[in-house]
Amino acid sequence: MTLQQEIIQALGAKPHINPEEEIRRSVDFLKAYLKTYPFLKSLVLGISGGQDSTLAGKLSQMAIAELREETGDNALQFIAVRLPYGVQADEQDCQDAIAFIQPDRVLTVNIKGAVLASEQALREAGIELSDFVRGNEKARERMKAQYSIAGMTHGVVVGTDHAAEAITGFFTKYGDGGTDINPLHRLNKRQGKQLLAALGCPEHLYKKVPTADLEDDRPSLPDEAALGVTYDNIDDYLEGKTLDPAIAKTIEGWYVKTEHKRRLPITVFDDFWKK
């Protein structure tokens, strides 16, 4: 088995999907989890205005609405959380995403004060954060807020990770990578667009340039610029297509060096890191 085949198998990626079937699969998956643990009453997700959180948010709201109708449990709710750092440049996209999702509840937690306070506390301890590390601080602060909300609403935190993100490890460890349940796992980027199109999402929300937008020195830095490959390259790789060797090597390089992000904390029984 080639490394490409191993990666495809590990991430559950498929070359072709039926969008309607995958929508139903994700919604039923979320519902089944909540039904298994009836003490859980909410799904919590940060909404950024980008493709991934818009899709995960819509699927979460659909799952909650269906489960509420089926069980009569009106305590069930989907909580969409806005988590800007100060003023977000693409705030209108966030509002458009909220309008499309129509969540049961919307909360806004501005993380700037908490991030600056943490940075100052570290500075007083003799640690000056780089812009890159400060970006990770933002991602972790966002997740901390979501877990606090979930803790107070008997909820679980929904993740936005998918195959095209997992393969490169393009997420913050214990930030946006630290979630309870990931309904998009297995899908590549273009497949996520297919699901949103099938759901009637406004096109600008899934055709916009993907960006983590974490670094102050490089605001709105496109994911593809940071990775050195395009999402079309990554999707083609995940669909089993043959790529230019240099591009394939870059993708596989990301996969190998970010393996630790896709695993639980390393123990004496692990040996993947010895490769």
UniProtKB/Swiss-Prot annotation:
The keyword Nucleotide-binding applies. Pfam families: NAD_synthase. One of its GO terms (molecular function) is glutaminase activity. Mg(2+) binds at D52, E165. ATP binds at G46, I47, S48, G49, G50, Q51, D52, S53, T160, K189, T211. Gene3D superfamilies: HUPs (3.40.50.620). GO terms for cellular component: cytoplasm. This is NH(3)-dependent NAD(+) synthetase. The gene is nadE.
